[in-house]
Amino acid sequence: MGIVGKAIKWTLNHIPRPLLQKVAGLGVPMLGMLYIGRERKCPICGKRVREFLPYGYGTPRKDALCPRCLALERHRLLWLYIERETDLLKGYPTLLHIAPEVALKRKFEQHYGTQYAEHYITADLESPLAKMHFDIQDIPLDNESVDIVICNHILEHVEDDRKALRELHRILRQGPRRPASPRPGRAPGALPTFTTGSR
């Protein structure tokens, strides 16, 4: 593990998450200037870099974090899925983005703009990046009040995932649904469509 990987690992393990979220948007892109190159292209920010930064709390993963927009592998995969396999970006559905990732949040804010900003809702337990703050197990939104929920890498961290899933089901408008976060290794066409009866 190189010095950058060690520095990132130390930072992740010693700086409180809310503070880290406030400063990472400035610090990492400055570090990214050292990674100017053409070998990698981030599908979220469109920037080319020599390589992605290592990232991880334990053993940092190589080539994980975009030094320009802070997107991780799972964020880039989700964005590609949204762009290529959904019609989310063709309109302005009410979208609840739980624990919004910095890079994805920027893209959605650009898409929704000021005219449709009320249709893009960000929420988190404590992140300063979110508009609303709540526990996903007790969502303070009305029944059937959102069209889409993006909840990436969260359910494995809650006390009662079944309760959280019931809450997500409660706030979603009725109709066909697809998972917002495809599991790596599955072809997009193989993703099942969830209907009211199968939820």
Regions of interest found by a model, annotated:
Residues 140-142, 159:
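GHKL-family ATP-binding catalytic core of two-component histidine kinases
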Residues 92, 146-147:
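Local beta-strand N-terminus motif with an aromatic residue
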Residues 2-140:
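Conserved N-terminal segment of class I S-adenosyl-L-methionine
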Residues 148-154:
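A short beta-strand submotif of the Rossmann-like class I SAM-dependent methyltransferase core
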Residues 101, 125-126, 154, 183-185:
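Histidine- and/or cysteine-centered catalytic micro-motif in compact active-site loops
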